[in-house]
UniProtKB/Swiss-Prot annotation:
Location of the region described as Editing domain in the Swiss-Prot/TrEMBL record: 1-145
The protein's name: Threonine--tRNA ligase
Highest classification ranks of the organism: Archaea, Methanobacteriati, Methanobacteriota, Stenosarchaea group, Methanomicrobia
Function, as annotated: Catalyzes the attachment of threonine to tRNA(Thr) in a two-step reaction: L-threonine is first activated by ATP to form Thr-AMP and then transferred to the acceptor end of tRNA(Thr). Also edits incorrectly charged L-seryl-tRNA(Thr).
Cofactor: Zn(2+)
Main location: cytoplasm
Length: 611
């Protein structure tokens, strides 16, 4: 930040014409006598630590004013002091921050000329040796500002409503205990690479893209099928719940004050770039686009709660290179994102319960057992303690509770549900949050019957968490399975037909055609390989149902089927079935779940290797 400080007899300004980034509701004309005029250019470097830039600038202004013996301050945005300016939104945040810090100083009279206006001004400089000073502010170079300590209190609430010491649970060897150990800061497991990293490649699902930025992946047909089915699944859940799908851009202009302020909440882990002379960012969630839609809508309280949903493909977070790993932490990911505009806090609490129930259900449907932590401010807990106990009771399992002494984010309450990986580390997936800032920030409002303007609470909900983390959790969960498998509805191949000899291939193809027509993903291993090798490779592909086709099967029409989920290690479970019984068995397992056809050739002889 660049400051030009002029001790003046008099300064006055008049705002004449708006620019496209002009502050609204600005004071159009003002003046001060015996004042320190502070001409200020907020620079791009200030965006790295706005809080520190504000603190240092305010300290410099206060020190200079006291040295000059004045308590009147005029803050004047003056872009001409620098050629490397911050985004307009960040600049406004800094200027408001400086104003707020100075207003809180005893005896000071503070005025601020508006940002983003063409202004006329007149200034009378006193002309003494200290009347013209310049300062350069670099965030992080001054003495560290004392940070207000946020207190965190942890405890467990049981479904019966009892409050328990969280540390007592940490001694157990359970998924819930693993979550508690992580939240309480216990030393975690180190060194071992997550199980899913090898599996995601071995199963030809997904792998790193070496020609892209780290944390950006390429998806093979088998992985793409699973990813698409999961997306279909979430869409079905959202539509059943009354959500309305939308689609919004992946990039946003940081010159918009609301965008810049919301982006600043997430710190430096953002992809930012220049588009001409505009500072842009890639979204890290679908909030920006949905809030923009809500801002432009005419909202009637009779339409609330209103739920908008987007499968955010892609969202971007510039995670530290050393933290990027597999499908757990990426820089580009797919986030199912629903935002619910509620009428009031009672409506938000009701919707929160409903969406939490959806989150628990996704863990069951995806066969990824979940554990939960509920976080809120102390004020919220004191007001809604009975409600918190109620959602734990409805969940039917104990939950870790974290109570914060003050609000530090846009939410006052949130729940995070997590699967536990093979090393005992949480994989946070579904979440629901009560946002009490964004409606104000983006001017999302409705009018009550008495004409009162209302900026209502907004729920953020990802019913599953990112699609990549869901697959991560499923793969990690297989480490505890004696015979690892995908849920049948997600298996890239649901039935594999293994002809014993070349003469059986035509019969196998006929069955394969009928199975696919019945809505079952089936393929035929027609390669010139031994039956044992074909069966072994079907096992490596985690195919749920494998049927060997020989002379007897061709004659009788009955198939000897190996059922993976009922098998034990080195002890396959086999059952004789008719073709219709096989169809019925698969349909029973996949009932109510989305279906997509094979993404790979039906004949394995025509299937390429990707990895």
């Amino acid at each position: 930040m660049r400051l030009l400080l002029i001790h003046s007899d008099h300064i006055e300004y008049e705002a004449r014409k708006k620019t496209k980034v002009a502050e609204e509701d600005a004071v159009q004309k003002d003046a001060l006598d015996e004042a320190l005029a502070v001409f200020c250019a907020v620079e791009s470097v200030d965006e790295e630590n706005i809080e520190d830039a504000v603190r240092q600038a305010a300290d410099e202004i206060v020190a200079t004013a006291r040295q000059l013996g004045t308590t009147n301050i005029m803050i004047y945005p003056y872009a001409h002091l620098s050629s490397d300016l911050a985004s307009p939104g960040a600049a406004v945040s800094v200027l408001k921050g400086i104003e707020g810090a100075l207003v809180g100083t005893d005896g000071f009279v503070v005025k601020r000329a508006p940002f983003g206006w063409y202004k006329a001004f007149s200034l009378s400089c006193k002309g003494h040796p200290l009347s013209e000073l310049s300062r350069t502010i670099l965030p992080g170079e001054g003495a560290a500002a004392p940070k207000k300590e946020i207190e965190h209190e942890f405890f467990v609430i049981t479904p019966e409503g009892d409050r328990k010491n969280a540390a007592d649970y940490a001694k157990e060897e359970t998924p819930f205990a693993a979550l508690i150990r992580k939240e309480l800061g216990y030393p975690g497991p180190e060194g071992a690479e997550p199980v899913h990293v090898d599996l995601m490649r071995a199963k030809e699902l997904v792998e790193y893209e070496p020609r892209a930025d780290v944390g950006n992946h390429r998806w093979m047909p088998r992985g793409k099928l699973i990813r698409d089915l999961l997306s279909d699944y979430v869409l079905t859940q959202v539509l059943d719940y009354g959500g309305m799908p939308v689609e919004t851009p992946v990039m946003y202009d940081l010159g918009d004050a609301a965008i810049a302020e919301h982006a600043a909440k997430f710190g430096e882990r953002q992809y930012r770039f220049k588009s001409g002379n505009r500072d842009m960012m890639l979204r890290f969630a679908a909030c920006f686009g949905m809030f923009s839609i809500m801002h432009d809508m005419h909202i009637s309280p009779n339409t609330l709660p209103m739920k908008l949903y987007e499968l955010s493909t892609y969202s971007f977070r510039h995670e530290q290179k050393g933290e990027v790993i597999g499908l757990k932490r990426l820089r580009a990911f797919t986030m199912p994102d629903m935002h619910t505009l509620c009428r009031d806090m009672d409506g938000a609490l009701t919707a929160f319960e409903e969406q939490l129930a959806i989150g628990w259900k996704t863990g069951e449907d995806l066969e990824t057992p979940l554990v939960g932590v509920f976080r809120c401010t102390r004020d919220f807990f004191e007001q809604y303690e009975l409600w918190v106990k109620g959602i734990v009771a409805k969940s039917g399992v104990p939950m870790l509770i974290e109570v914060l002494s003050e609000r530090t984010h846009y939410w006052i309450a949130k729940v995070d549900l997590a699967a536990i990986d093979a090393q005992g580390r949480p994989i946070e997936n579904p979440t629901v949050q009560i946002d009490v800032e964004s409606a104000d920030r983006f001017d999302i409002k409705y009018y009550a019957p008495d004409g009162t303007e209302v900026h209502p609470p907004i729920l953020h909900c990802s019913p599953t968490g990112s699609i990549e983390r869901v697959i991560c959790a499923m793969l990690e969960g297989t480490a505890a399975q004696e015979v690892p498998s995908f849920p049948t509805w997600l298996a890239p191949t649901q039935v594999r037909l293994v002809p014993v000899a070349e003469r059986h291939i035509c019969f196998a193809e006929e069955i394969d055609t009928r199975l696919n027509a019945a809505g079952i993903r089936a393929d035929v291993d027609d390669r010139d390989e031994s039956v044992n090798k074909k069966i072994r490779e079907a096992g490596m592909d985690w195919v749920p149902y494998v049927a060997v086709i020989g002379d007897q099967e061709a004659e009788t029409g009955r198939l000897m089927v190996t059922i993976r989920k009922l098998s034990e290690k080195k002890k396959p479970f086999k059952e004789s079935m008719t073709e219709s019984e096989l169809v019925q068995a698969v349909k029973l397992e996949t009932a109510g779940k989305p279906f997509r056809p094979l993404y790979t050739p039906r004949l394995l002889s025509r299937k390429p290797r990707f990895i």
